[in-house]
Amino acid sequence: MFRRSVFRHSPPRFFYQTLTTEAPVALAASSRRMILFCDHPLEHTDRLRIKTGDAVAAGQRIVPFMDASAYVVAPAAGSIRAVSAFVGDFGRNWTRIDLAVEDRGEADAGFAAAAGQVSMETVRRWMNGLPGGLDTEAISGAEAPIETLVVAATESDLFTVSAQYVLRHRTQNVRRGIDVLREITGAQRVILAVGRDTVQGMGHVHAEIRAVSNVYPASSHGLMLREVLGREIPPGTAPAKAGIAVVPVEAAAALGRSFAEKRVAMEKIVTVLDKTGRQSLFEVPVGTPVADLLASLDIRLDSSDRLIAGGPMTGICLYTDDYPVRPDTHCLLVQDAAAVGRAGSDPCINCGECVRICPARVPVNMLVRFLEAGKYETAAEEYDLFSCVDCGLCTCVCPARIPIFQYIRLAKYELTLSRAAEAENA
């Protein structure tokens, strides 16, 4: 997982974990409630289509607002227990829908009727929130016609093995999903990007197989596309604008399974690590409360423990376990309070460790000075802010314990908002 040369001074190297063939996946105990986040703010309750007590069928599209098309898909049957506003990281506003699960609820027949015809419209109407995180906007070809489809069967962070499990044990679903994606996008070229240690035995999948380095962060989209396509995407440019769609392998598998079974497949593979580092793989519906998943493993959260969704390098810290497993929640990591590394308040000592380890060759020591001062435009124009691949290595090696990665995420988010507002008002 971690190596440093003993013969010369060089940056440490981190390696993705390889899934062992014996790794089992367990079904978590069924939760009696579900939490769903709709990507639309709850500003006016009088515009709601739904209310507390409404019955919900399994697989039903829930469209909360009269004047917005945003929707979620119910992973289980039951009734709406509450509808409330929720503020996520960086102040993003969502609508939270709490469901009370009922064992004898009905299944919705809407997708079963639509699944007879594979089309982009069907995918966009039903597959938002699919496990793995399918970006229906990116694959729609709205930016540019999709010429190349890259199915990423690589891990998003250290300690996670969810993608490898899906590739190895849901291969038939992956194959079906690739066929569906090829049909709806019209892509002429389909590539399956896999870790170098797992490339064997993938020849029967309907795609070109390309191996990706097992040195972190080779799986980040920018670095991965350079390795498998031999071309670079300009900094700050979405792959879709270059005619490239990147789809996580779990999303491809869920897509294939959905059309095969004629139901929206909402089962998510999650890697869970407890305070001792013990690793478990679970299959749970999207929307399962994190608290319920941890309880099924007898993991207790104490004061000042850290709960991370997404992995140790790029994950986000959750302030509560009353939070759902989301489509992109590949990993849940629980850290004991005594093992938590706290951010420091010291200024940069200009040691250069962050510059040496940066895979994108960003002058991080200069960049962080402008980010701390809130000079985001200068950071983007003069110090390659958008060249950053969001790997978190700079924060990991910083002796001053500066939360560099968090500064970078905040800057990118703020600049994206401001530039979108400028374009809208132009």
Language-model features: locations:
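Short, conserved beta-turn/loop elements at beta-strand boundaries and strand-helix junctions
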Residues: 82-88, 300
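Short, well-structured beta-strand-loop connectors
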Residues: 50-64, 80-82
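N-terminal, Lys/Arg-enriched amphipathic/low-complexity engagement segments
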Residues: 1-49
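Ferredoxin-type iron-sulfur electron-transfer modules in oxidoreductases and energy-metabolism complexes
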Residues: 330-345, 355, 359-426
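Phosphate-binding glycine-rich loops and their immediate beta-loop-alpha structural context
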Residues: 128-193, 362, 366, 375-379
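Active-site gating/interface segments in enzymes
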Residues: 218-219, 223-229, 260-262, 298-349
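Acidic low-complexity segments
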Residues: 87-148
